[in-house]
Structure formats: C-alpha cells, structure tokens
C-alpha cells in the first residue's frame, strides 16, 4: 500500500472510524495524539504565563490566635476544633486553586485577624 492509498483511505473514513484509528495508534505505539503546546518568545524575552489559580497558605497565627481561628472558621466553614487544628498546623493551606481576587480577599481577612499569610 502506498502513502497515497493510505491517505485516500483515511480521507474516506467517518469521524468515529478516525477516532478509533487514533486510539489504536496510541495504544500500538505508546504515544499520545494530544497537540504539543508551543510557547513563543515575545520581543526577545521569555513569555511568562500569568498565574490564574492561587493557594492561600497560613504561615502562622501571630499573637491573635483566637481571631485567626475565627477567621479560618468563617472562610472554610470548618468547626471550631478543625479550624484550631488548621491554625496549629501552620504553615498550612487554607484554600487551594482559587481565583486571584478570592485569594487576596482571604489573605486580607486573615492578616486583619493577625495572621501571616502567603499566596502561591
């Protein structure tokens, strides 16, 4: 079979048949058909992708541990014992994979309560 014949056969296949062909090729050759992501450089510099999801990390409760526990309870919806456990285990993630706006609001609330917080 020539390359032209192979291409002609593929051209005449239905979408479901093409999907099965791709899956069979992936299994047979141990490869993935997902498209490679190519990132270009902008004006001689590397392109830096802006982070869209943030983790709010409680570094320590500071001197106002009770206020920080109350803030953690309010933010997470945890009970008193669970919130105290989170504060005692600092550094600990309070919220993960949230938007920048939400992360900054939570950080402000925890810092207002006396905690030391970082966003990652």
UniProtKB/Swiss-Prot annotation:
InterPro entries: Ribosomal_bL12 (IPR000206), Ribosomal_bL12_C (IPR013823), Ribosomal_bL12_C/ClpS-like (IPR014719), Ribosomal_bL12_oligo (IPR008932), Ribosomal_bL12_oligo_N_sf (IPR036235). Pfam families: Ribosomal_L12 (PF00542), Ribosomal_L12_N (PF16320). One of its GO terms (biological process) is translation. Forms part of the ribosomal stalk which helps the ribosome interact with GTP-bound translation factors. Is thus essential for accurate translation. Belongs to the bacterial ribosomal protein bL12 family. PANTHER family: 39S RIBOSOMAL PROTEIN L12, LARGE RIBOSOMAL SUBUNIT PROTEIN BL12M. This is Large ribosomal subunit protein bL12. It comes from Alkaliphilus metalliredigens (strain QYMF). The lineage of its organism: Bacteria, Bacillati, Bacillota, Clostridia, Peptostreptococcales. The gene is rplL.
């Amino acid at each position: 079979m020539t390359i032209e014949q192979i291409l002609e056969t593929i051209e005449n296949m239905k979408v479901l048949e093409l999907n099965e062909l791709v899956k069979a090729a992936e299994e047979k050759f141990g490869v993935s058909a997902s498209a490679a992501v190519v990132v270009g450089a902008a004006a001689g510099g590397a392109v830096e992708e802006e982070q869209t999801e943030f983790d709010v990390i409680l570094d320590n409760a500071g001197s106002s541990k009770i206020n920080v526990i109350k803030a953690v309870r309010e933010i997470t919806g945890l009970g008193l014992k669970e919130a105290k456990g989170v504060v005692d285990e600092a550094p600990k993630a309070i919220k993960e994979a949230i938007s920048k706006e939400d992360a900054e609001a939570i950080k402000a609330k925890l810092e207002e309560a006396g905690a030391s917080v970082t966003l990652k």
